[in-house]
Amino acid sequence: MEIRLPDLALKRIFSFLDLFGLLQVSQVNKHWNRIADSDYLWRSLSLQRWDCSNFTNQHLGTHTWKQFFLHQRRKELRLALAQPHNFIYKVTKNIAFETELAYLSGNRLTVDEQEKSIICSVSPKQELCAWDVQEGTMIWSSPVQEFHFSNLVTLPQMHLAITMDRKKTIKVWNCQDRDALAVLPMPQPCYCMEAYLTKDGPFLMVGDAAGDIYTFTLPGLRDVSKVTAFQYGIVLLHCSPDKKWVFACGTYSRTLPQVFLTESLLRPSEGSVPLSTFLPHKLCASACWTPKVKNRITLMSQSSTGKKTEFITFDLTTKKTGGQTVIQAYEIASFQVAAHLKCPIWMGASDGYMIVFTSGPYLLLFSITGFLLQRFEDHQAAINNFWVDPCYVLTTSENSVHVYMWEEGGRHPYLRSCCHLENTWHDHTTDSCISSVMCDNASIVLRVRKVSDSSILVMYSLNT
């Protein structure tokens, strides 16, 4: 006699499965297929993999969450499986300036097959520019600015770009209208900005040279809160993937970094101090949140001589004590990088149990406890640029780019070597190097700095 579990119990069991598990159980019988195809399970899978908490049924249209998930995965795999001949590339003239690049398009989270990749850059004339990556054309530019841009971030979900200039002025642009949507002068230079979207709306967080963290609404730049975090400037400011936590680190290396509860910054109470805790490790050089374990953060700590590097991983929780909420940070793992390895500059994380970083020409993947999982030798010379997100890892060396992809569900091989793009665009008559690299599901963008101090953009897109 066949035992039929209630729908709720079966849905609970299926919630522990990954993509491949759900697809397998859906083939057992009609009952299991109906449960395995439910929007609840596929939305849960989507939330685990992407920042789509604000993606609604209205965005889906007539599509289901299963169709949405499989569509996104196909796009990810399409880039990962591409070979050099599958790309076309466009090269700009000497019109790029050495400041940040940022995607304005939300290419990753759509069900539109005709989506475009749009990148923001700054020109030598101090214009903010938006580029159609597939066409290689500039589609918008701001008026020439009086002062140089010092910082650029975007909020793709809102199609907004936010700039800071050397006059300490923040401006918000929609990259369609001529003028900025909002302008706000700041009392101090700002070293870092973070734009993010929550269930309460879009916000901008800014860390300044005085050690203060400001929170503003977007696009209007209305003041929400100001918190003094350090007595020195803030150089690192990172929101956790679920936007629940904010990591902040000051310029003074012996100051302990802090983690704030985002809600206490967005809803400040008069006379009360925002909830925060110190992470008990000094000399923090970099930090990254884990996309899959959203309350987990890994710090990279380096000695002043640069000869000793340590990775420390913490889990953050809140706890009620005596009627008050407190933040607790638990160190769950740490390890020191072997002395014979070149001191890493960049780092990234994926599933909560692995750390990826560069060392000379090598890309290394370690467990958070210090066990070497993979070593990649896809470059002959030292890696001079590195970029990581929940799907891809990019490395550059001299004038080539290598693409890696994280395996689904932390399966072996944990990080897959995919595609190597050589310098087909390179002008061999001049010296140059790649100074920035990033990608979305349909494109790879490089900024290449020439010896003359001018820069160009090289925009790869998949040939459809």
UniProtKB/Swiss-Prot annotation:
Pathway: Protein modification; protein ubiquitination. GO terms for biological process: protein ubiquitination. The keyword Endoplasmic reticulum does not apply. Keywords: Repeat, Ubl conjugation pathway, WD repeat. It holds the Pfam family F-box-like. Gene3D superfamilies: 1.20.1280.50, YVTN repeat-like/Quinoprotein amine dehydrogenase (2.130.10.10). InterPro entries: F-box-like_dom_sf (IPR036047), F-box_dom (IPR001810), F-box_SCF_Substrate_Recog (IPR052121), Quino_amine_DH_bsu (IPR011044), WD40/YVTN_repeat-like_dom_sf (IPR015943). The keyword Repeat applies. WD repeats lie at residues 89-132, 136-174, 178-217, 222-263, 270-315, 320-367, 370-407, 416-461. The lineage of its organism: Eukaryota, Metazoa, Chordata, Craniata, Vertebrata. One of its GO terms (cellular component) is cytosol. It comes from Homo sapiens (Human). The gene is FBXW12. Substrate-recognition component of the SCF (SKP1-CUL1-F-box protein)-type E3 ubiquitin ligase complex. Promotes degradation of interleukin-22 receptor subunit IL22RA1 in resting and IL22-stimulated conditions by facilitating its ubiquitination. Functions as a cell growth suppressor. Ubiquitously expressed. This is F-box/WD repeat-containing protein 12. Interacts with SKP1. Interacts with CUL1. Interacts with IL22RA1. Residues 1-45 form the F-box domain.
